[in-house]
Amino acid sequence: MKSLLLFLKSQVFGLTVETLNGERNGDFEQQKENHGAKNVAPQGIPYQSSYYGQKEQAKRVIDGSLASNYMEGDCCHTEKQMHPWWQLDMKSKMRVHSVAITNRGDCCRERINGAEIRIGNSKKEGGLNSTRCGVVFKMNYEETLSFNCKELEGRYVTVTIPDRIEYLTLCEVQVFADPLEVDGTEASDSSESVDGTEAPASPESDVELPIASGMNVDLTNKSFMFPKESDINHVKLLPEKAMSLKAFTLCMKVLLNVPENRETILFSYRTMFYDELNLWIERDGRIGLYMSGDGIIFPRMKFKSEWNHLCLTWESKYGRTEFWLNGRRSATKVYHQKNTVRSGGIVLLGQDQDSYGGDFDKTQSFVGQIKDLKMWNKVLPLRSLKSLFKGREIGNGNIFDWSSLSYSMIGNVAEV
């Protein structure tokens, strides 16, 4: 699946921490007066990960206009792809006070949800691993939001939609920044060498780089191995379709290497503010399911010291929820009747997300191996579940399927 990244207009403004705390929309000329920095975006060079139309679109984001109709040529637009991005080369290192972005006004306001603004000194992969300035939770049509970057330093400003296939559309980006000075002179650019090749970027202490990733990879007869307790190691899964769910079946095989009396996360799906679908082994060995609030607990079942095959089913209409382990049903419960699992989140194996995509606790991390993960946006019939437990082929999962999985591995995770 491919995603489109749609940029309207982006502007970067510099503000002191005292004058802007977090995101804000309003009078940007007043912001400029507060922090004294000017919008440097129009003097920069824009790039983007792909082009839905002409390459000149990238420049529309820094033309100084807050017009927001893509059909009238006001915005830039990427193809639908995994983590699309738009990047501004400010030509030298700058101290960035704030960045403001303007959303599209004629269509598709929700596409920008979850976008991240990043500042750094590397243009590699669009600066996706640079330091994060802010996250767009939600924007209205034509809305302009400003994000306090707290004087982050770097040459490149990136707007990206991470961890999902999407279009990126921006109508204006404004960057309020001051040139960096070293011993009274402006700092020279060190991100490129004299022959034009990119120099190594300085490491960001709070960023863990992917060690491997793939799109629609066949992992048949392979597994993800999490060798030890960690607050880093995890795998991000990229769904084949939006996870707006009124029913699901989630199945996987796990080989555990954890002591008794330890909480262990099996599957974590979180949107910006909520745990949408978290599956746990509780401290007492029972199974816990948590979907946006209070959870339910299934009776303890004996996990084998070898591979264990588990399945979880849920449907919204009646709230019928079941957990299966190695072909045996633990219990049937009524849970979250009439509710919906919301889309736009991050799916992780190996870690529980206490915040959107982060705040991991190594004492809850998964240790062992996971394989044969499949997920459907429906409850499979009993016959299909029994066939699955017997190792028979029942067709591919339409959200996740082990024979065509899109993912990225972070930290010390091995594909074996």
UniProtKB/Swiss-Prot annotation:
Disulfide bonds: C251-C311
Glycosites: N129, N221
Cofactor note: Binds 2 calcium ions per subunit.
Positions of the Pentraxin (PTX) domain: 220-416
Single GO MF descriptor: metal ion binding
Residues at which Ca(2+) 1 binds: D275, Q353, D354
Gene3D superfamilies: 2.60.120.200, Galactose-binding domain-like
Alphabetic keyword roster: Calcium, Disulfide bond, Glycoprotein, Metal-binding, Signal
Keyword Zinc set for record: no
Cofactor: Ca(2+)
Claim: Disulfide bond is one of the keywords in the record: yes
Signal peptide: 1-14
Name by which UniProt lists this protein: Pentraxin fusion protein
Organism: Xenopus laevis
